[in-house]
């Protein structure tokens, strides 16, 4: 779900924190991509003309593999070095949101069966997309494909977005890429959205900078996280009557959620009983992640035979197209630079100016003058 209305808040209150770039602007960058979000996106978007998920002759879903293969090709074609991060176990606090999702899936399946009988094609498609769920098999097959492609991946102990943010904070990658805005709550220095969208959508990459967001909002990291919880996140249900504008106003008025919960008018703001905002805050500020510094990311040459065996012989992909994709991978692995030039230069703190030693400067000048005189004598 992410954070409700956060993109709107940043565009209004911290416009300098948001910019939109062409994918080519990220040539030479390393990016950690939320694989679980990407797979969900592929299962929804990569479909046949009749709106159904792609399948092979055995009836196995292949939308996730088609998306992972060709969207990753587009990324490496543009000189980006991706690594993918997969979800681990969900935090206990997320069980409420997960239960709601299961209920929504079940309701959507029932509605889908009804609309197949009496509804339009558009209605059937809409309800079909609500039933999408990323399974362990989808994850395992995506990991197998990435390994064959020579693209590194990381198994996060918990939330993939949090691990992407940790990799970006450690400097192992330039940015975290996800459609979930809560990646910023995990203190990703830079968040990229729309990186794994199809080229046909012609969507620019939206880049969010956390430091500029905090400056624009005039908030600390803790206040920003409190704001996001108040907006509504996966860990806490939103408070009725509190939209984006009101949430910003309340954090500025009370400073913290602690004061808001303690002092706010409950008749005006019906805060749920046992509202776990403190636990949510802790999950954002102290997420369970692998230390980014200890993770080694290695990009390798693709295993052409392995890719053909998996995608063509096992999953029924078109062999000619897959071979063209392999050629693109091999070309990218040879041409993508180790790093951008600007990554080698870090700002150096300016040292205080030293007082000018006029005496030594004068003596140096006299020495230069005498040398010049000596040289001119020699020339004569």
Swiss-Prot record:
<keyword id="KW-0597">Phosphoprotein</keyword>
<dbReference type="GO" id="GO:0035312">
    <property type="term" value="F:5'-3' DNA exonuclease activity"/>
</dbReference>
<dbReference type="GO" id="GO:0035861">
    <property type="term" value="C:site of double-strand break"/>
</dbReference>
<feature type="binding site">
    <location>
        <position position="234"/>
    </location>
    <ligand>
        <name>Mg(2+) 2</name>
    </ligand>
</feature>
<dbReference type="GO" id="GO:0000287">
    <property type="term" value="F:magnesium ion binding"/>
</dbReference>
<dbReference type="GO" id="GO:0043137">
    <property type="term" value="P:DNA replication, removal of RNA primer"/>
</dbReference>
<dbReference type="GO" id="GO:0003677">
    <property type="term" value="F:DNA binding"/>
</dbReference>
<feature type="modified residue" description="Phosphoserine">
    <location>
        <position position="351"/>
    </location>
</feature>
<dbReference type="InterPro" id="IPR006085">
    <property type="entry name" value="XPG_DNA_repair_N"/>
</dbReference>
<protein>
    <recommendedName>
        <fullName>Flap endonuclease 1</fullName>
        <ecNumber>3.1.-.-</ecNumber>
    </recommendedName>
</protein>
<dbReference type="InterPro" id="IPR006086">
    <property type="entry name" value="XPG-I_dom"/>
</dbReference>
<keyword id="KW-0479">Metal-binding</keyword>
<dbReference type="GO" id="GO:0070914">
    <property type="term" value="P:UV-damage excision repair"/>
</dbReference>
<keyword id="KW-0540">Nuclease</keyword>
<dbReference type="GO" id="GO:0032042">
    <property type="term" value="P:mitochondrial DNA metabolic process"/>
</dbReference>
<keyword id="KW-0227">DNA damage</keyword>
<keyword id="KW-0496">Mitochondrion</keyword>
<keyword id="KW-0235">DNA replication</keyword>
<keyword id="KW-0255">Endonuclease</keyword>
<feature type="region of interest" description="Disordered">
    <location>
        <begin position="340"/>
        <end position="380"/>
    </location>
</feature>
<keyword id="KW-0378">Hydrolase</keyword>
<feature type="compositionally biased region" description="Low complexity">
    <location>
        <begin position="342"/>
        <end position="353"/>
    </location>
</feature>
<feature type="binding site">
    <location>
        <position position="161"/>
    </location>
    <ligand>
        <name>Mg(2+) 1</name>
    </ligand>
</feature>
<dbReference type="GO" id="GO:0008409">
    <property type="term" value="F:5'-3' exonuclease activity"/>
</dbReference>
<keyword id="KW-0269">Exonuclease</keyword>
<feature type="binding site">
    <location>
        <position position="182"/>
    </location>
    <ligand>
        <name>Mg(2+) 2</name>
    </ligand>
</feature>
<dbReference type="GO" id="GO:0045145">
    <property type="term" value="F:single-stranded DNA 5'-3' DNA exonuclease activity"/>
</dbReference>
<feature type="binding site">
    <location>
        <position position="159"/>
    </location>
    <ligand>
        <name>Mg(2+) 1</name>
    </ligand>
</feature>
<dbReference type="GO" id="GO:0017108">
    <property type="term" value="F:5'-flap endonuclease activity"/>
</dbReference>
<dbReference type="InterPro" id="IPR029060">
    <property type="entry name" value="PIN-like_dom_sf"/>
</dbReference>
<feature type="binding site">
    <location>
        <position position="87"/>
    </location>
    <ligand>
        <name>Mg(2+) 1</name>
    </ligand>
</feature>
<dbReference type="InterPro" id="IPR036279">
    <property type="entry name" value="5-3_exonuclease_C_sf"/>
</dbReference>
<dbReference type="InterPro" id="IPR019974">
    <property type="entry name" value="XPG_CS"/>
</dbReference>
<feature type="modified residue" description="Phosphoserine">
    <location>
        <position position="350"/>
    </location>
</feature>
<feature type="binding site">
    <location>
        <position position="232"/>
    </location>
    <ligand>
        <name>DNA</name>
    </ligand>
</feature>
<dbReference type="GO" id="GO:0006284">
    <property type="term" value="P:base-excision repair"/>
</dbReference>
<keyword id="KW-0234">DNA repair</keyword>
<comment type="subunit">
    <text>Interacts with PCNA. Three molecules of rad2 bind to one PCNA trimer with each molecule binding to one PCNA monomer. PCNA stimulates the nuclease activity without altering cleavage specificity.</text>
</comment>
<dbReference type="Pfam" id="PF00867">
    <property type="entry name" value="XPG_I"/>
</dbReference>
<dbReference type="GO" id="GO:0005739">
    <property type="term" value="C:mitochondrion"/>
</dbReference>
<keyword id="KW-0539">Nucleus</keyword>
<dbReference type="InterPro" id="IPR008918">
    <property type="entry name" value="HhH2"/>
</dbReference>
